[in-house]
A protein has these predicted regions:
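Sec/Tat-exported extracytoplasmic proteins
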Residues: 43-50, 63-67, 71, 94, ...
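Hydrophobic pocket/interface hotspot
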Residues: 42, 59, 67, 121, ...
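Short beta-strand edge/turn micro-motifs at domain boundaries
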Residues: 139-168
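Surface-exposed, charged secondary-structure patches
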Residues: 69, 73, 81-132
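Solvent-exposed loop/turn segments at secondary-structure junctions
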Residues: 75-76, 126-129, 160-165
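Short, low-complexity N-terminal intrinsically disordered segments enriched in polar/charged residues
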Residues: 19-61, 175
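A short, polar/proline- and glycine-enriched secondary-structure boundary/capping micro-motif
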Residues: 80-83, 132-135, 165-172
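Bacterial Sec-dependent N-terminal signal peptides
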Residues: 1-24
Length: 175
């Protein structure tokens, strides 16, 4: 009985691990060949007009399987909170909204630091519902951790915070 239980546990863990693997889908080389390429691909894949389905498989190819996506900001009660998601959580939670409402996010500033195969990017963004909108409805900073495995770049994590009146983006992150 113990052997059967152990076999079931091992199979369950194996299936759970491989079912959500983002690195099992081949990436388009031009999406992951450089830091610029992977950052541009990230913004591109979440952006599009209302009614347009996003290429979520393309998004999956940008991230390591264990990647985290986290939003942080001030709650209504004044405390600072966070929401931690997997790539699949992000697609499930944000995907329908982005596709229904329309969403275009673009990079308007970048600061990057590299040590070996690790890069940290502070990527300042603005967001619009339609490309032709005169003003963005939101701005903020994406803190993006990247890793190169010797063949390509991967996104390890994205932590973002939107700008607020009491927390404007410093000028040094806008150029």
């Amino acid at each position: 009985m113990k052997k059967i239980f152990l076999a079931i546990v091992i199979l369950t863990i194996s299936f759970t691990t491989f079912a959500g693997r983002t690195d099992s889908i081949p990436a388009k080389h031009s999406d992951v060949a450089s830091v610029d390429a992977i950052i541009n691909s990230l913004y591109n894949v979440i952006s599009g007009p209302a009614g347009e389905k996003r290429n979520w498989d393309r998004m999956r190819t940008l991230f390591i399987a264990e990647a985290k996506m986290m939003a942080t900001g001030k709650r209504q009660d004044g405390t600072i909170g966070k929401r931690v998601m997997t790539v699949e959580d992000y697609i499930t939670v944000s995907g329908p909204f982005l596709e229904k409402e329309g969403f275009f996010e673009r990079e308007i500033g970048r600061k990057a630091e590299q040590y070996g195969s690790v890069v940290h990017v502070f990527s300042t963004y603005d967001s619009k519902r339609k490309l032709e909108d005169e003003k963005p409805f939101m701005r903020g900073i994406n803190s993006i951790q990247l890793w190169n495995d010797g063949k390509r770049w991967w996104i390890v994590s994205v932590l973002w915070q939107s700008e607020t009146p009491d927390n404007p983006i410093p000028e040094k992150y806008l150029n």
